[in-house]
Amino acid sequence: MGRRKVEIKRIENKSSRQVTFSKRRKGLIEKARQLSILCESSIAVVAVSGSGKLYDSASGDNMSKIIDRYEIHHADELKALDLAEKIRNYLPHKELLEIVQSKLEESNVDNVSVDSLISMEEQLETALSVIRAKKTELMMEDMKSLQEREKLLIEENQILASQVGKKTFLVIEGDRGMSRENGSGNKVPETLSLLK
């Protein structure tokens, strides 16, 4: 007799749901461990219970190494997607420039109508405004990041200045303490005359 098929749907009873989560989580982690051993691979499992408790397990490598590799790979994918989007955005501009170039070649100058030239001019102005808007956006982002960096540097400078001020104050107070008489009535000896 085989196992009966369980319908996959939300378990209404809270305690049954928690027990099922615990058992299946343990089974998932065990399967991940077995896969790691069998295939000599690094596997990370992260599960969050309905109550918000985090469970994680790593096989093959430690969790931080696996997550670092994932982040590097994910960043590369995002760069590739960003590059593909930029290419898609620039293709119409490239095609437009090719059309303008072909229309303005000497052999085609006689065949270009005024309406066609006006249309090309409007398309070029539209493309130029899009490019200028993107340029402005990028410049604003750069300016914002530079302002944030400036703010951080000013805060760091203030912290360092206050630390230097405290050290200077301690040195000055220390010098004053050295020049005063100590409790027994004897003066603290001054530095050697050779060192002055």
UniProtKB/Swiss-Prot annotation:
Mostly expressed in roots, leaves and flowers, and, to a lower extent, in inflorescence, siliques, pollen and shoots. Keywords: DNA-binding, Nucleus, Transcription, Transcription regulation. Its main location: nucleus. A motif (Nuclear localization signal) lies at residues 8-15. Induction: Repressed during vernalization. Regulated by HAM1 and HAM2 via epigenetic modification of chromatins at H4K5 acetylation during flowering. The keyword Transcription applies. This is Agamous-like MADS-box protein AGL70. The lineage of its organism: Eukaryota, Viridiplantae, Streptophyta, Embryophyta, Tracheophyta. The gene is AGL70.
